[in-house]
Amino acid sequence: MNLSDAINAVNRVKDIINSHNTWRRKETINLIPSENVMSPLAEYFYINDMMGRYAEGTIGNRYYQGVKYVDEIEAYLVDLMSKLFHASYVDVRPISGTVANMAVYLTLAKGGKIAAVPRQCGGHISHDEVGAPGAFGIKVIHLPCDEENFSINVDSAVKVIREEKPQLVILGASLYLFPHPVKELAQVAHENGAYLMHDSAHVLGLIAGGQFPNSLNEGADLMTSSTHKTFPGPQGGVIFTNNESIFKNIQRAVFPQLTSNYHLHRYASTAITAIEMMTFGESYAYQVRLNAKKLAEELSKYGIPVVAEARGFTETHQVVFDASKFGGGAKVAQLLEDGGIIVNKNMLPWDRSAVRPSGIRMGVQEMTRVGMGTQEMAEIAAFMKAILIDGKEPSSVKGEVKEFKAHYTEVKYGFKLSDVGIKCDCLPLNY
C-alpha cells in the first residue's frame, strides 16, 4: 500500500470511529442493560503500556520478567474488589464474564451437570448448552421458571436439584428484574453435594451500592461477573469466593487452561471504577433503581405492556416489556433505534424462538450515569410512546431525542481528570 492509500485507509478508520462516538455518545438514548460508560479518569488510565505486555501466572509467581508494576496494580485491584464485595478471594484475570464462568465450569462441573435458568426465562447464553457448558461436555438441567413473576419456581427447582443432583447450580440472569432465591437454593444444593454460583454480571454495581443482595452473604459458594454493566468499568471478568480450596483450583483454570494474557491494561481503569463505586456507588445504585421504576411506570401508564406489574415491575436497572402488539421485539428495537433510542430484543418466558422474540429489554444504568433522573425517565417514556402508541415516524422523533440528549454529555458519579490534578484534552470521547 502506498502512502496516499494508507492515509486514506487510516482516515476511513478515523471516520468510522468518530461517527460511532458521536452517534452513541451524543445523539442517542442508550438503554442496553449490558453496557455503560467509564468516567473520564477511568478512560484516561485505560490507555497504558500494559496493553502490550504479558504476565502469565499469579501475583509474585509469573512466567515473564518486567512485571513488578503489573503485580502491584493487580494486587491493589484485588484488594479493592475484596473490600468492596466482602470476598476473601478474588481473581481479576478473566477477560470477560463468560471466561469467569468457564473457569468455574472447568473447576467444578467439567463433564458433569449444571442446573441453570433457561434462556427464555432470562438465563445467559454462557449458562446454556449452546454456549460454554456444551463446549465442556456439560449437561444443562433447567431450573423451572415462575413465568408470571419473572423468577424461579423455588419448590420445583428444589425438586430438580434433588432428583438430578448437578455438580453446580447457577443463579443470576441476563434478563434480571428481581433477586433470585440464593439462600433457599444454596441450602438445597449443599445438601445434595452441589456448589452454587451466582452470575452477578448485570447487578454487580447494584451490589456495590447496597441496592441488591450480595450472594456470598446468602450462601453462594462463588460469584462471577463482568465489570462493565452496572459496575461501570472496562470490559473484563472477575470471580469472588470465600472458599480457599475452590479458589486455588479456579486460579489454575484461569491460567493455564483458559487464558495466557489477561488484558492487563484494564486493571487500572477497573481499580479507578472500584474506587468510584466506594465513593459514589451508594447514590448511583439508588438512583438507578429509582429511574428503572419510573421508566416502567411511565411506559405502563401509556399502555405499553411492561412485565411484572404485580411485583412493581423491577428491582434492578432493567425494564422489560412485551412488544407483541407492536410487531415483536426485533421490529420494535429497530423502530426505536431509528428514533435514536437504543434497546435490545429479548426472549420472554413464553417465547420459543431466540430469532423472533417478543420482548424488549432495557437498562437505565448508562443514562443514570450521565445525570438523568426520574423526570428524564418520563421524557424517555414519552418519546417511546410517540413512536409505539401514537404511530409517529421515528425520523420525526429522532431530532427531539438528539436535542434532549445534548444536555446529558458529562459522566456523573465518578472522577474528572481535574479532580486529581490531570490537565489533558486528550480523551477522544468527550462524554
From Swiss-Prot:
Name it. Answer: Serine hydroxymethyltransferase
Q: Which InterPro entries match?
A: PyrdxlP-dep_Trfase, PyrdxlP-dep_Trfase_major, PyrdxlP-dep_Trfase_small, Ser_HO-MeTrfase, Ser_HO-MeTrfase-like, Ser_HO-MeTrfase_PLP_BS, SHMT-like_dom
Family per similarity comment: Belongs to the SHMT family.
Top-tier EC class? transferase
Quaternary structure and partners: Homodimer.
Write out the pathway annotation from the protein's UniProt entry: Amino-acid biosynthesis; glycine biosynthesis; glycine from L-serine: step 1/1
Gene Ontology CC: one annotated term: cytoplasm
What is the required cofactor set for this protein?
A: pyridoxal 5'-phosphate
Taxonomic source organism: Caldivirga maquilingensis (strain ATCC 700844 / DSM 13496 / JCM 10307 / IC-167)
Protein's job: Catalyzes the reversible interconversion of serine and glycine with a modified folate serving as the one-carbon carrier. Also exhibits a pteridine-independent aldolase activity toward beta-hydroxyamino acids, producing glycine and aldehydes, via a retro-aldol mechanism.
State the Pfam families in the record: SHMT
Asked if the Swiss-Prot or TrEMBL record annotates the protein with the keyword Amino-acid biosynthesis, the reply is: yes
Keyword Cytoplasm annotated: yes
Q: Which GO terms describe its molecular function?
A: glycine hydroxymethyltransferase activity; pyridoxal phosphate binding
Q: List this protein's GO terms for biological process.
A: glycine biosynthetic process from serine; tetrahydrofolate interconversion
Kindly list the positions at which N6-(pyridoxal phosphate)lysine occurs in this protein: 229
Lineage, top-rank taxon, reads Archaea
Quote the subcellular location field of this record. Cytoplasm
Residues annotated as site: Plays an important role in substrate specificity: 228
Where (6S)-5,6,7,8-tetrahydrofolate binds, per the record, is at 123-125
**Alphabetical UniProt keywords:** Amino-acid biosynthesis, Cytoplasm, One-carbon metabolism, Pyridoxal phosphate, Transferase
What does the record give as EC number? 2.1.2.-
